[in-house]
Amino acid sequence: MNHIAALPVGGATPLLQLRAVKKRFVQPVDLAGRLANLLGANNQASVVHAVAGVDLEIHAGEVIGVVGESGCGKSTLGRVVADISPASAGEVRYRGQRLQDMSASQRRAYALGVQMIFQNPMASLNPRMRVLDIIGEAPVVHGIVSAARKAEYVADLMRQVGLDADYGQRYPHQFSGGQRQRIGIARALALKPQLIVCDEAVAALDVSIQAQVLNLFLELRREFDLTYLFISHNLGVVGHVSDRVVIMYLGRVVEIAPTETVFSSPNHPYTQALLAELPGLETRRRTYQPIQGELPSPLRPPSGCTFHPRCPHAMSRCRTEAPVLRMLAPGHSSACHLNDVKENLQ
């Protein structure tokens, strides 16, 4: 694992803090349901709890990995952090100040200071714009650089992300997938952010290109003292870049720990299952071990511990009572009733 430990300074205010953050989406009644209502049915809108009460602190200079299967709420969490999709409840604090209490100018500064890199670089880049404008338009609009220095500014950024500066007049379709993702990275860097949310930023790339882009993220972190929230369904990818790892399942954090701890001493059965899916030389495992069962619908999450239908260690308590995150060791917390059983046996 080629990451650099970034240990929070004791007592230091986190760069970003989430407190009981929730994000709900309302799914309206479809046409068939509305027609049925005319005949006396009582179909009602459904509520999806995409993020169901997340607490998290991110300190300046560290990389937090967020891992989970598709549909677990990790991308929604990233959009909440980037203020693309505001939280339905809870608090988001930036340098100790609540977003709700910020003035309009402070909120704009936050929007510039927290940038997002998306999974599909082709879909996130305007196909009608040249790279010079894709990267350089926003910093000119926000007064970061003058229009006269735009071309020079963009050329420097392109070189920093490993692109030929002479390609500024090209369009996105004239680049490979890895090059397009580098354009997206340069666009984020152009606004001089403090925190970058990387949402499956290498998932659409070939494995060989993934390694190059991951190493680029690490180099840029060292050069610009960046902070990352790195979202991925692949625990192996997150392990390559992260200082701490957050495991999410159906909108909730089930485990959070230093990266080394997650790989050497995972506590939650879901974390253990994610690790079992990873083929690797370290474990001498040659067969793929998928997680049993299907991810439940967030429209109808299971009662109690939402992982219990797929958990090989589920007890009767797991079906009725939702576990809470509890600290097992400094920096390591897990939400599993098995920890109570282990404690009672000691």
Please describe what each predicted stretch is:
Residues 33-39, 98, 149-166, 275-276:
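Conserved ABC ATPase "signature" region
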Residues 42-43, 99-115, 133, 141, ...:
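ABC ATPase NBD coupling module
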Residues 190-194:
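A short, proline-enriched helix->beta-strand linker immediately N-terminal to the Walker B motif
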